[in-house]
């Protein structure tokens, strides 16, 4: 199982090709390609490469599937004995990113077609 740890949208995520992830809104049109070059770690066939802080020449490519909103978070402020109450809600804007491949120095080390054949062979 190959994976990479990336930094995107102010978060660090463990990503694998063929899976989708919800990250903070990116401002890119849906169905467009997106390349992330802030790769912190790559694990390929038990060969681990750690960057300082990023792995040189490593990129993770994906496709923006859609933009959506997260679950509503309720913020409730109350001052006791003062009859002061505020109830607010917040929904975070998210982008759904489908990871297609992990590349190092321009060569693909793993892509989603390789992951699909692995899962079909196991069945």
UniProtKB/Swiss-Prot annotation:
This protein binds to 23S rRNA in the presence of protein L20. This is Large ribosomal subunit protein bL21. It comes from the Bacteria. HAMAP family: Ribosomal_bL21. Belongs to the bacterial ribosomal protein bL21 family. NCBIfam families: L21 (TIGR00061). It comes from Rippkaea orientalis (strain PCC 8801 / RF-1). One of its GO terms (cellular component) is ribosome.
């Amino acid at each position: 199982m190959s994976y990479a740890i990336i930094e995107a949208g102010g978060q660090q995520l463990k990503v694998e090709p063929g899976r989708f992830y919800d990250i903070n809104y990116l401002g890119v049109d849906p169905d467009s390609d997106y390349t992330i070059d802030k790769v912190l770690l790559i694990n390929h066939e038990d060969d681990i490469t750690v960057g300082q802080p990023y792995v040189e020449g490593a990129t993770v490519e994906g496709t923006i599937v859609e933009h959506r909103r997260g679950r509503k978070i309720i913020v409730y402020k109350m001052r006791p004995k003062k009859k002061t109450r505020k109830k607010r809600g917040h929904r975070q804007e998210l982008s759904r990113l489908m990871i297609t491949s992990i590349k190092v120095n321009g060569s693909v080390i793993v892509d989603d077609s390789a992951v699909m054949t692995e899962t079909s062979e196991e069945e």
